[in-house]
């Protein structure tokens, strides 16, 4: 007999079902496991089912109701590293970046557990919220399977350059790297993306007056976007400092001012 398995959206434990109908019903309701439903942290309301808990209060609403450089940073970060599937959102980072995941969780007032995955040595947060996820995907023109389906940059032209630079910084922290470029004071930012994102990056960099260096990786569907002028790298780092942005410090500390 087949066994149907899903993950508790609150604690990450596997929940096993004998019958497919029970599995589908629980999936639709985003039900939590028995341990979590019995926990003192669960909140039950009249008219709700037993497993209908506070998990639905998690949302990404702050990312489209409070527009700021920090908000656009996080939007760029989840464009790079976040995952959207139906009414579900997930963000997973390696163990070394757990603190950064906790900062994001704090920013969106995430109330569930951040779950450790031993097989990948990573941490993740995840939740379902039909209204909130639909709203943010619509507001920022984010598509499902976003690796291959880029956002339309024209949907971002109403943002000023400070917000767009914050967006780029978030993308760099999610999909980019910062490395030495041959000498002590020389560095290079490299972003790797599917070739379908070429127009998006070309328009974003052009709007920010950053020289466009985009090349296709031979034999693949991948492009690399490079930023290496020292005055631009220092400007970006000063922008981070002046706006007190929460970023991945291990990356930006590579750029030295002297």
PLM features: residue spans?
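Internal intein/HINT superfamily modules and their associated LAGLIDADG
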Residues: 2-20, 24-258
């Amino acid at each position: 007999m087949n066994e149907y398995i899903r993950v508790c959206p609150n604690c990450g434990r596997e929940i096993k079902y004998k019958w497919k109908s029970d599995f589908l019903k629980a999936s639709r309701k985003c039900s939590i496991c028995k341990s979590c439903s019995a926990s003192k942290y669960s909140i039950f309301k009249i008219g709700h089912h037993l497993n209908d808990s506070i998990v639905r209060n998690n949302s990404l609403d702050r990312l489209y109701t409070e527009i700021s450089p920090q908000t656009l940073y996080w939007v760029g970060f989840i464009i790079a590293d976040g995952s959207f599937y139906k009414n579900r959102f997930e963000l997973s980072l390696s163990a070394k970046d757990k603190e950064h995941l906790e900062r994001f969780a704090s920013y969106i007032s995430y109330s569930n557990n951040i779950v450790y995955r031993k097989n990948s040595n990573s941490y993740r947060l995840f939740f379902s919220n039909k209204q909130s996820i639909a709203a943010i995907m619509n507001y920022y023109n984010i598509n499902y399977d976003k690796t291959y389906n880029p956002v339309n940059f024209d949907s971002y032209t109403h943002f000023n350059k400070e917000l767009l630079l914050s967006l780029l910084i978030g993308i760099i922290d999610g999909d980019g790297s910062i490395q030495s470029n041959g000498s002590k004071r020389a560095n290079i930012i490299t972003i790797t993306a599917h070739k379908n994102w070429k127009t998006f990056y070309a328009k974003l960099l052009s709007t920010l007056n950053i020289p466009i260096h985009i090349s296709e990786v031979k034999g693949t569907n991948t492009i690399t976007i490079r930023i290496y002028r020292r005055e631009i790298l220092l400007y970006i780092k000063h922008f981070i400092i002046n706006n007190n942005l929460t970023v991945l410090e291990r990356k930006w500390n590579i750029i030295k001012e002297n």
